[in-house]
């Protein structure tokens, strides 16, 4: 979403505006997810858009290249890490992170056979294999996003309590219940290894 080189050369204000753009498209991302059956404020950012709605016409990309949600979350992390602008997290970023984490928590399923959480029917960022199960990158960025959302919620609660209360009311966020679920999924995620690939 925002490259390190761009952060280093374009200036903090420009980089922040790119993330504010993502925040301004959040309600459309929630609508996009709702069209696919997701609920409770889960968001799926579009692969291609002019107004926040998905404009891509290849279903594998639209429905399966969902790692893009992780790129949005990582852009927030990277921007704050690089600039120190923690105000962005309370102003805009946490709402995006909560909605992305809600998407992952609903998209990931439990496998009784593996006794782990799995990610079925995705296309990874290399686009070489479509409609695969347990793409390592997609599973990893999903788990990372849920953990980062939980950490960010705790940070905003402790450091910006008025903003935290506003966000909880606006997004109907129950930190205790939701973050418990996110961390349970992240801790129990199945990841392919060389042993599993050779089986």
Q: What spans do the regions from the language model cover?
A:
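Helix-terminus loop motifs that line ligand-binding clefts
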Residues: 13-74, 80, 87-91, 100, ...
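Hydrophobic packing residues in well-ordered alpha-helices of helical domains and bundles
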Residues: 15, 93, 179-182
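Alpha-helical scaffold segments in carbohydrate-active enzymes
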Residues: 21-28, 95-107, 144, 148-151, ...
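Acidic/histidine-rich catalytic neighborhood
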Residues: 103-173
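Well-ordered alpha-helical scaffold segments within catalytic/enzyme domains
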Residues: 3-13, 60, 71-86, 103, ...
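Conserved small/polar residues in nucleotide/adenosyl-binding loops
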Residues: 1-2, 195-199
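Catalytic cores of glycan-processing enzymes that make or break glycosidic bonds
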Residues: 50-56, 115-122, 139, 170-182, ...
């Amino acid at each position: 979403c925002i490259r390190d080189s761009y952060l280093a050369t374009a200036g903090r204000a420009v980089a922040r505006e790119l993330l504010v753009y993502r925040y301004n498209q959040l309600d459309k991302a929630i609508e996009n997810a709702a069209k696919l059956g997701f609920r409770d404020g889960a968001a799926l950012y579009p692969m291609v858009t002019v107004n926040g709605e998905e404009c891509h016409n290849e279903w594998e990309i639209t429905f399966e290249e969902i790692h893009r949600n992780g790129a949005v979350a990582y852009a927030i992390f990277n921007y704050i890490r690089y600039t120190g602008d923690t105000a962005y997290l309370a102003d805009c970023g946490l709402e995006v992170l909560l909605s992305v984490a809600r998407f992952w928590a609903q998209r990931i399923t439990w496998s009784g056979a593996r006794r782990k959480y799995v990610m079925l029917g995705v296309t990874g960022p290399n686009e070489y294999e479509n409609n695969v199960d347990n793409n390592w990158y997609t599973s990893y960025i999903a788990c990372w996003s849920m953990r980062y959302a939980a950490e960010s919620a705790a940070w905003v609660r402790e450091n910006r309590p008025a903003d935290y209360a506003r966000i909880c009311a606006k997004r109907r966020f129950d930190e205790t219940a939701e973050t418990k679920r996110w961390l349970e999924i992240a801790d129990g995620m199945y990841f392919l290894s060389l042993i599993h690939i050779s089986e």
